[in-house]
């Protein structure tokens, strides 16, 4: 087989297509969770912490004090924006929680499906024919 034929064959395998689908869905899910964190959860956290917006927290390494991060950057000061790290950690925890919830629900559904009793198998065709033969003999 040629290179492109091998490549096409590997793409057509179910595992590759499943992985591609998972990546696309994961990207979309990440955007949804990111929006939920940024637009819903972080404002609530901000209210609970007295109106603190973590993304604006920074330390200027030159030792000077600036009104905000934009002013420090305009002045050319090197800054440690630790607020962005806090925001990323919170995002990670929330995304991990949502993924855990989804996986747990999928596991429960799978266990429920496996535990569902199967209907008892009826008599086989051979058994039915034997019964008919016996009835006809009577």
Curated annotation (Swiss-Prot):
UniProt KW keywords: Cell inner membrane, Cell membrane, Ion channel, Ion transport, Membrane, Transmembrane, Transmembrane helix, Transport
Main subcellular location of this protein, as a coarse class: membrane
InterPro entries linked to this entry: MS_channel (IPR001185), MSC/AndL (IPR037673), MscL_channel (IPR036019)
Location in the cell: Cell inner membrane
Transmembrane segments: 9-29, 32-52, 83-103
Region (Disordered): 113-133
UniProt membrane topology term: Multi-pass membrane protein
MF annotations from Gene Ontology: mechanosensitive monoatomic ion channel activity
Physiological role: Channel that opens in response to stretch forces in the membrane lipid bilayer. May participate in the regulation of osmotic pressure changes within the cell.
Similarity-based family: Belongs to the MscL family.
HAMAP family associated with the record: MscL
Complex formation: Homopentamer.
Name of the protein described by the UniProt record: Large-conductance mechanosensitive channel
Organism field: Flavobacterium psychrophilum (strain ATCC 49511 / DSM 21280 / CIP 103535 / JIP02/86)
